[in-house]
Amino acid sequence: MAVVPTRFKLFNKDFMAQFKEEHQKHFPDSEPAIGGFPDAGEGRYSEKLDYKSWIEFNNSMRVHQNFVELLPVIVTFLFVGAFVLPKLAMWIGILNAVARIIYSVMYVKFGSNSRALGAIAGSLPLYVLGLATFGTLAWSTFAH
């Protein structure tokens, strides 16, 4: 999401040039990767960023990591919910996608204290879907 443009903006060719000599000493047949790979915000390349750039990159990385961590939960809730309540699952999936965009933009632009709107808007409907799915399954199982 937001990490790729931020990565290439901060770890551009000019920035990576400062690592060329050391890199070629250890890897003579290659150049340092533009984009700062494999640095994830706490490595050798990030140490050379100014404070503002480091915060910007780390906020982008945290948004990315949060998305990666929650993706299995989101997909599982939507997959199971779609068998029981397909229209509700569809709308919650759309709402979650919009909420993830809001979460990403707020976190990257304004920092971690501004992510609450997107986090709540994305998580709460998933829990509602989970409860509705469980309730529907329980009702259909035990009502007879």
Question: Which role fits each region the language model picked out?
Answer:
Residues 1-9, 97-104:
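Transmembrane alpha-helical segments that form the membrane-embedded catalytic/substrate-channel core
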Residues 4-53:
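Membrane-interface amphipathic/juxtamembrane segments adjacent to transmembrane helices
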Residues 57-66, 90:
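Short, amphipathic, aromatic/basic-enriched membrane-interface segments that mark the entry/exit
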Residues 65-78:
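Core segments of transmembrane alpha-helices
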Residues 72, 95-103, 125, 129-132:
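Membrane-embedded alpha-helical transmembrane segments of multi-pass integral membrane proteins
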Residues 83-95, 108-117:
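Transmembrane helix-loop-helix
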Residues 102-128:
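Interfacial loop-to-transmembrane junctions
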Residues 131-144:
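Juxtamembrane boundary at the C-terminal end of a transmembrane helix
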